[in-house]
Amino acid sequence: MTILHNFINSSKRNLSILGIFLLLLLVSSCSSNEEMPDERLVEKELYDQAQTRLKNGSFSTAILSLEALESRFPFGRYAEQAQAELIYAYYMNSQFEASQSASERFINLHPRHSHTGYAFYMKGLAAFTDDSGLFSRYFQSDLAKREVVMAQTSFGELSEFISRYPESKYVPHAKQRMIYLRNLLAEHEIYVADFYMK
């Protein structure tokens, strides 16, 4: 009798777990379908949808729209603009490596495009981001003590941007960022010197 009772209880528990799993699966599939761009949208509608999402700060869904626009209409009217805006959307969505990759891709595909300077600028910005996330708010990490390869890379990328596009409207911000990075690198050198002097 106890064997049958245990079997029934374990079956009920397994069914409950299965039911919860199916419910979660159903809810997650419904929510992701709302964010995905409608496959029936024409190029202009998809572009407008992406613009609305960017303006609203919905960067993850804007990325979906821009990627769909680029993949469905690779030679369309908005393809190059979508590629440029993907750089920004990735960056704003804290997908810095994707932003760098999108920048490099845009530079390679469109070396003479009017937005190529912007791609160089964003590539430099995305190469280094300080710890402004949740972890660093609670655990004060000293950026000067960390590995600074990314800061050096960012400094080099921004320097290249300024030398190639000295008249760009992004140059003043790039120069400010380079001052910040130079100070960070100097702090790191002082930290290393202090470490070896002890």
Residue spans for each PLM region:
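Bacterial N-terminal signal peptides
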Residues: 18-27
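Bacterial N-terminal signal peptides that target proteins for export
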Residues: 2-19
